């Protein structure tokens, strides 16, 4: 039965995708079936507009973003940081992605995923699937399609998209592909 606290995508996973994966891959136990663990969202924007970016992404994701800092200030490892190298080069892009991030879990994760899947499936957006994660980089043009910030996008025009990493409990890339295809087939 559909509970008002559950998202349609979460209901679809529990009632359709999970039993389907159990039969397709022939697991011995239903707890072996891959599931979504978390979604990590990292916005791309200039560092001086990080407050506007955090606000926009909090509106879209439904959860507060945490401010992060670089882990070190000197040493060899700092030289290989591509963002620091961009700041020192003549061809500076001015966009950093490590200043704010959010990790979505539970109902908030499924609410965000429902909006994301709707946009991705409509525009046939490419994703990169690895062993236990699904990665995609959303452009600014697709960010405008989120209904929460659609009418007030001029306030958030400095956002240059965001990176999304969907972490699953899958053990192989094939399991991750099957899980992701189950979410994309859902008509929302």
Curated annotation (Swiss-Prot):
Disulfide bonds: none annotated. Pfam families: Ribosomal_L5_C. GO terms for molecular function: structural constituent of ribosome. SUPFAM superfamilies: RL5-like. GO terms for biological process: translation. One of its GO terms (cellular component) is ribosome. It comes from the Eukaryota. It is found in: Mitochondrion. InterPro entries: Ribosomal_uL5, Ribosomal_uL5_C, Ribosomal_uL5_CS, Ribosomal_uL5_dom_sf. The keyword 4Fe-4S does not apply. Keywords: Mitochondrion, Ribonucleoprotein, Ribosomal protein. Belongs to the universal ribosomal protein uL5 family. This is Large ribosomal subunit protein uL5m. It comes from Marchantia polymorpha.
């Amino acid at each position: 039965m559909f509970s008002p606290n559950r998202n349609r995508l979460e209901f679809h996973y529990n009632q359709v995708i999970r039993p389907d994966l159990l039969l397709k891959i022939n697991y011995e136990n239903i707890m072996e079936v891959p599931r979504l663990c978390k979604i990590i969202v990292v916005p791309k924007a200039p560092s001086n507009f990080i407050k506007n970016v955090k606000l926009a992404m909090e509106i879209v994701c439904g959860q507060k973003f945490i401010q992060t800092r670089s882990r070190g200030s000197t040493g060899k490892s700092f030289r290989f940081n591509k963002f620091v190298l961009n700041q020192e080069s003549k061809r500076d892009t001015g966009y950093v992605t490590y200043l704010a991030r959010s990790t979505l879990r539970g109902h908030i994760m499924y609410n965000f995923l429902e909006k994301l899947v709707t946009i991705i499936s409509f525009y046939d957006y490419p994703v990169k699937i690895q062993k236990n994660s699904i990665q995609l980089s959303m452009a600014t043009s697709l960010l405008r399609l989120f209904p929460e910030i659609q009418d007030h996008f001029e306030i958030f025009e400095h956002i240059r998209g965001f990176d999304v990493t969907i972490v699953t409990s899958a053990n192989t890339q094939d399991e991750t592909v099957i899980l992701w295809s189950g979410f994309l087939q859902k008509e929302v």
